[in-house]
Structure formats: C-alpha cells, structure tokens
C-alpha cells in the first residue's frame, strides 16, 4: 500500500518530536548553571511581565540578554509561568528546539525536491534524517539544556522561519513551475521573523545573506536574476539590520565583544583556528561533553602550528564547492556563514569558543552527510541497488539512536555543576573552567580546593585574579586579597566586573585594614562608575569620617542629601559628624528627621538623645530615651543613658520629667 507524502511528513514530524523528547528529557531537572544566574535568577527585569518597557529593556550588565529584548521577554514569560523553577525554562528550550528541528525538516524537504537537487523520491527520508540527527546531536546540549543557550535556539527558530518563508514566498513554485498565491503573506512572515530574530541575537545578521545564497543555489542560475526577481524581499530583510544597529547603540557589548573588547582581531582569529577543528571533532566523535572553551588566549602562529591550516582549508573547500556545484556548496557555505558572527575576526573576549555556536552551522554539515550517505548507497552494484534505501534507513536510524542516547547521558553530566566544570577542565583547560569550578567548591565550603583553582587561573586573566581576590577576602586573608584585587584592576581597568565589583571589594578590604583614606578614594571611583547609586558615596563619606576628615565627610553627606533629602544613612552619619564638629544645632534637625520617619529605630533615638543632651535640651533627650524604653523596657543602654541624664540634671539642679506610664 502506498503511503502519501503528506502522511510520511506527519510521521516524520512525530519521529523527530519523539527523538527530541528522548534525548533531552534527562536534562529537565538540571539546575541553573553559569550565566543562568544573571540571565534569570538575578535578572529583575524579567520579574514584572506587566511592565513591558522594563522587560524589553534588559539591563546592560546582564550579558546574555543585554540588547536582546525578545530573548529577555521569553524569560519573563517563563518567570510568570514557573517562577524560579528551572524545569520550566528547560521545557521551553526543548520546545523551541523542536520547533527549530521541524522548520529544518520542512526546509530540507522542500529543497531536495527542487530541480537543482533532483531528489524527489528520497526527499522525505533525507529531510527526516537530517532534522533528527541535527536535533539529537550531543553538541546541541550547550544550546538546549543550558538555559542561557536559548539565545541560539530562539535565534535559530527565527533564522529557519525566515528561510522557510522566503522559500514559500517564491513568485512561482520552483518544483512545479506554477505561480504561488501567497507571495505577499509569506514575504511578511519572512520580514517579521527576521526583525524578531535580530532582537534575539546579533548573529541573525547573516539571515538576509543566507536567503540570497539559497535562491542562487537552488532557484536562479545567476545572482543578477535573483536580484532582479526578488530585490524587494532582499531589501526588506536587509532593512532589519537597523534593529541590531539600534539595539547595539542602546546596549553596546564593547566590554565583552567587538574591536574594543581588549583582544586583537588577529589573536581572536588564531583562537578560532584552534577551536574550529575541535568543533569538528565533537561533531564527528561526540564522546565527551565540552561546554566552554574559556576566554581567548594570547597566541602566535607558532602556538597554532599545522592544525591552524584546517579551518582555512575548509573555508577554501566550501567556496570551491559553491563555485563547482552551488546546490552542494550552499550547505558548506552555510556552516561558515552562520558561524562567522562569533568565530571570525570580531573578538568576543569572554569566550574563545563554545559548542553551542555550532547550533545553526551543524545543519549544513548534517545535510551534506545525509545526502552523501544516500548517494553512496545508490552507487552500489545494480544487482544490489534494491537494498540501497533500506541500508540508508538503517544507517540513519542507528545513528539517531546512538546520538540520542549519548545526548541523554551527557545531559546527566551537565546536571552536576561540579561535574560540568571538572569535565571542561579535563578536556579543554581554561581559566574559565578553573574559576567556575572554584565558585562551585566555594559554595560547598571547600575553600582550600577552590583557592588552588583560583591561583591556577590568576595569571591567565583579570577576572580570575579578581575571583581569587574575592575568595581571599571572604576567607579573612585581607592583605593578600588587596594585592590580588589591585593587580586585577591594574591589568584590566575597563573590564566591567573587575572595574566595578573589584573596586567595591577592594574598598571594603582597605577599610578593614584601617586604611580609610585609601578606601575613600576607591569608593569615589566606584561612585563615578555608578552615578545613580548613593551607597558608594555614603561609604566614601564614612571612610573620610573614619580617617578624621570631618569637613570632607560632611561635604560628601551633603551631596547625597542634595540628591536624596530623606536618605536616612546620610542624615544619621552627617548628624553624628556635625556633633563631632561641635555644630550641634545643625545636627539636631537631621537626627530628628530620621527618628521621626523610623519610630522603631532604637539607634536613631539614641543618636537624637545624645544630640539633644549636647544641645542642653534635656527634656527632648529624655523624651527620646523614654521612647526607646516604652518599646523595650530592658534596654540597658537606654537605662544607663537616662540615669546619666538624671545625675547630670541633679548636679545642675534641673528637674527632669519622668517617662510617661505605659
């Protein structure tokens, strides 16, 4: 009995869904990992879905979502539905991954039927095998199981949607040679998907180029013809580049990516020619989980060696294949086109490489592999040709099962933070792995082990040295912490975390060592980096006061109060500073203000009592102390202060009223 192509398509979609669930269900209980903390747990902008302006304006310090409003919105929806239950976020990632796989299935199924390919008969097999292998390959774990990897998954959904809609928007059915009645609608779908994708991740910028190359490879015999027939679509898609431009202006990534990221394009390129062969190894033989490659290293040509020829030769081979046979060349060019935004000469200082960057590029490799397997089996001797289709199916089925089982197993490894970073350290040693393993060990109270890893990474970058400094500070080794933190700041004064958080910890460390003037200077630097935050200004003023610079402290407190007149900390400490300066009449209003706003603040009323007593306002001082005792009759400090007041009053022959009866 013949089965219709439509029925096979539905069956194929079901098989792909089954494979995805089998491969990734083991990762649903994985806790928040690595950047997930800043992306979700500490990201306040996703916790108020009703405030769309806040949701669509993620803070610049949340690296995975900065300048990516649609990505941030997806996390906000998850938070509204599941709170901080990591399983809900994982389920969304898996669902989006399945959507991407089904879109890839449709794209391949349509494409192999085109005259330029001429594989009408095995189209369903090739499409199902391609989408399933792509979906369950272990290298995809970094994008699917890693919650913050959603940027790659959601962007890929948009990328595939653009290509699928562009195919459906052809002014004629390329396979059947007849007109399409829905050109305008599919054009709009392609345009909307492209614009949304640009607001998910910047790597979407190559999507318009991919559409042009696809048309040339499979539909038109010349670029000129494609441009003449579809220039409006190409122009509309290219116009969405403005979305990326606006978002990058609003939330630049200059500290972590781009030509001002602290890594030269040449150095970054040398890192890529080492990383890309490792990607290939993980694709061909995914025997282990390699999550991250760490920050870019300072390399020379001598460090790269002969392996540095692999990536350039593959690029040349892809271009050669494109010129010889565009239909086969497109998947090869696709690999480098989709990889280029993260793996060429534009530096990403925080990551030299990551397996999740192969999320989209893998599709091109799998297409070439599946078509290659089919072609090889078709070239068997004529008398055995009848077994070619079953053999192709068997090879694909076995591969899908093995890959899905491997992915399921590696997902379990991913679920352990310590196991994840130990595995990364064993397979690709980096300061990132040392640093994150140390963070896990610190959480478990294994401080000596953690410090060993931080010391191993300290000489490899300022972030690692900063982490070592923080760990030493938390361990009470303040002098050592100051040395490491100062070195980290000197080595990389513009690195965001080091520049801000490093200075915060350094200032606290200096204060603990009674180096108050130095601490005040560092707090001033923190205040300059966070102009709207009064906390470092208050700390600076407090350190000036501790250093004996009372006039300087008073001036700093006044600056805070000019910006926030009811700032209790500034009012309290300025009032105490004025008392030490003998300016009691100026101190009293400040201390009264704090006590009036905070009736249960014992310290505020004690300060007011002291100031009132110094001003000779005994009744007011007694009233403040009585207020404390009314709430806490056993407060020893208040009792002693009241007794002192009474003795002083008796000596001066001044009558002091009793506290009101409770």
Task: Give the residues covered by each predicted segment.
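Polytopic membrane enzymes that build or remodel cell-surface glycoconjugates and lipids
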Residues: 1-474, 535, 573
């Amino acid at each position: 009995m013949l089965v219709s192509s439509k029925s096979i398509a539905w069956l194929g979609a079901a098989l792909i869904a089954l494979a995805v669930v089998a491969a990734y269900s083991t990762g649903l209980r994985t806790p928040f990992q690595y950047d997930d903390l800043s992306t979700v747990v500490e990201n306040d902008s996703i916790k108020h879905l009703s405030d769309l302006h806040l949701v669509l304006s993620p803070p610049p310090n949340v690296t995975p979502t900065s300048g990516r409003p649609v990505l941030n919105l997806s996390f906000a929806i998850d938070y509204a539905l599941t709170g901080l239950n990591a399983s809900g976020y994982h389920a969304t990632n898996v669902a989006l991954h399945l959507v991407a796989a089904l879109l890839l299935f449709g794209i391949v199924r349509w494409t192999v039927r085109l005259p330029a390919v001429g594989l009408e008969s095995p189209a369903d097999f090739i499409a199902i095998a391609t989408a399933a292998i792509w979906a369950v390959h272990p290298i995809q774990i970094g994008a699917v199981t890693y919650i913050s990897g959603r940027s790659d998954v959601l962007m890929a959904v948009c990328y595939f949607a653009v290509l699928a809609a562009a195919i459906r928007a052809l002014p004629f059915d390329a396979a059947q040679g007849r007109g399409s009645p829905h050109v305008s609608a599919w054009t709009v779908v392609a345009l909307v998907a492209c614009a949304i994708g640009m607001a998910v991740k910047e790597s979407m910028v190559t999507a318009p180029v991919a559409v042009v190359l696809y048309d040339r490879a499979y539909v038109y015999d010349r670029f000129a013809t494609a441009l003449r027939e579809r220039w409006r679509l190409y122009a509309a898609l290219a116009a969405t580049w403005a979305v990326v431009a606006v978002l990058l202006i609003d939330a630049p990534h200059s500290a972590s990516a781009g030509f001002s990221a602290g890594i030269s394009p040449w150095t970054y390129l040398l890192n890529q020619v080492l990383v890309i062969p490792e990607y290939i190894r993980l694709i061909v033989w995914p025997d282990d989980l390699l999550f991250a490659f760490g920050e870019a290293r300072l390399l020379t040509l001598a460090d790269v060696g002969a392996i540095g020829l692999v990536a350039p030769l593959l690029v040349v081979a892809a271009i050669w294949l494109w010129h010889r046979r565009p239909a086969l060349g497109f998947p090869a060019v696709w690999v480098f086109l989709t990889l280029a935004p993260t793996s060429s000469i534009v530096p990403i200082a925080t990551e030299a490489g990551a397996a999740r960057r192969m999320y989209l590029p893998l599709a091109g490799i799998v297409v070439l592999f599946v078509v290659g397997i089919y072609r090889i089996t078709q070239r068997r001797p004529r008398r055995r040709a009848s077994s070619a289709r079953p053999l192709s199916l068997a090879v694909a089925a076995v591969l899908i099962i093995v890959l899905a089982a491997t992915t399921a197993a590696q997902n379990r490894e991913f679920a352990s933070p310590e196991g994840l970073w130990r595995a990364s350290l064993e397979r690709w040693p980096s300061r990132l792995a040392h640093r994150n393993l140390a963070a896990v060990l610190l959480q478990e109270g294994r401080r000596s082990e953690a410090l060993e890893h931080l010391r191993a990474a300290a000489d490899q970058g300022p972030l690692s040295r900063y982490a070592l400094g923080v760990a030493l500070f938390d361990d009470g080794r303040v002098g050592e912490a100051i040395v490491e933190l100062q070195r980290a700041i000197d080595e990389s004064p513009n690195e965001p975390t080091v520049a801000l958080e490093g200075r915060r910890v350094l200032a606290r460390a200096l204060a603990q060592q009674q180096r108050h003037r130095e601490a005040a200077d560092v707090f001033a630097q923190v205040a300059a980096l966070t102009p709207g935050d009064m906390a470092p200004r208050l700390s600076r003023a407090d350190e000036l006061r501790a250093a004996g610079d009372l006039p300087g402290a008073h001036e700093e407190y006044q600056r805070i109060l000019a910006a926030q007149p009811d700032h209790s900390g500034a009012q309290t400490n300025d009032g105490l500073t004025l008392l030490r300066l003998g300016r009691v009449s100026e101190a009293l209003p400040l201390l009264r203000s704090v006590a009036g706003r905070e009736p249960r603040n014992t310290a505020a009323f004690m300060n007011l009592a002291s100031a009132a007593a110094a001003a000779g306002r005994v009744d007011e001082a007694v009233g403040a102390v009585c207020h404390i005792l009314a709430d806490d009759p056993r407060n020893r400090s208040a009792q002693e202060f009241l007794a002192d007041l009474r003795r002083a009053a008796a000596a001066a022959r001044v009558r002091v009223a009793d506290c009101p009866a409770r």
